[in-house]
Amino acid sequence: MSPHQFRKLVSPVYVVFFAALSLSAASLQAQSPATTAAVTDYVKAEMQRQHIPGLSLLVAKNGKIVRAEGFGVANVELQVPVKPETIFQSGSVGKQFTATAVMMLVEEGKVGLGDPLTKYFKDAPASWKEVTVRELLSHTAGFGDYPKSFNFRKDWTEHELLKLVEGIPLLYAPGTKWKYSNFGFLTLGILIHRVTGEFYGDFLQQRIFHTLDMNSTRIISEADIIPNRAAGYRLVKGELKNQEWVAPMVNTTADGSLYFSILDLAKWDAALYTEKLLKRSSLDQMWTVAKLKNGQPNKGPYGFGWFIDQRNGHRCIHHDGSWQGFETAIDRYVDDQLTVVALTNLAGAQPGKITQHVAEMYLADK
């Protein structure tokens, strides 16, 4: 999710103070000392250039941690350093978990990718009869996004959110174009609830997070006491400000409302090399660019919950996220079995730039 009122970034003149030394590095595989030093220097330089208070970096190879390290501070006011256990908000990196949950239900025969949405939403507009689950997963359904008038501080009910989505006309005929839509994934979360009887976050907790021992990963709650939770920030006219929170319900939707750490994401990454959660055929389908009705690949290019690209000859599935003073990115070079994750606590930061450059350094160090 990326509502504009929470992402606006003015050209900064204020330099955020952050700890000069990185903390708690975990190194479980051999790596070139030169690459290690170069990555450290690059990350610190980018943090200073982008004015990022804190960053958590994961590099994994063959499903094993190469580097799990914190830089800077998780809380500026208290000067709490970032460490591998520090918990950040996911933003839209959470969409891959939603897509995985839907594919679990597909494998169990409870959901069909070609099913029309009206199978699950009986009171939906007639136009939804032409929209399939597959099209929601790939952002080709014609769904829009949060309108500018959306009140993020109203504590919506799930029913109210669904009625809001249903009331917005489709932007194009389903399956004919690609347009990124948070509302599409929000609707998938409600679909999961209707099919299983379990709230989206509870389904993820039981079927994914518990299965993989992702003990710090969960739905966002500002009310709960969350050990190791980072604070989110934004820059306003060059001055660092605390992020202002949204209503509780808006922090529980399936378009990207999770807490996690890089250590938990390392477990997630390792599981994607196995069939612990899904069959290989299901994962391959998620990581293949979905086709439009004319047989052409969509212009995302997007699969189910993942962007799919070629970067300098290397296949990369990836996603970034933006929400409430946090920016995140995960890049998985699946054929090279290399994964790089960067979690940051500044709205408008560019963690995807960092993950891509760090990956290039490791790919060059073969």
Summary of predicted features, one role per range:
Residues M1-V10:
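N-terminal secretory signal peptides that target proteins for export/translocation
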Residues P12-A25:
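Bacterial N-terminal signal peptides
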Residues A26-A30:
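Sec/Tat signal peptide C-region and signal peptidase I cleavage site
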Residues G54, P84, Q89-V93, L105-K148, ...:
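Active-site helix/loop module of the DD-peptidase/beta-lactamase fold
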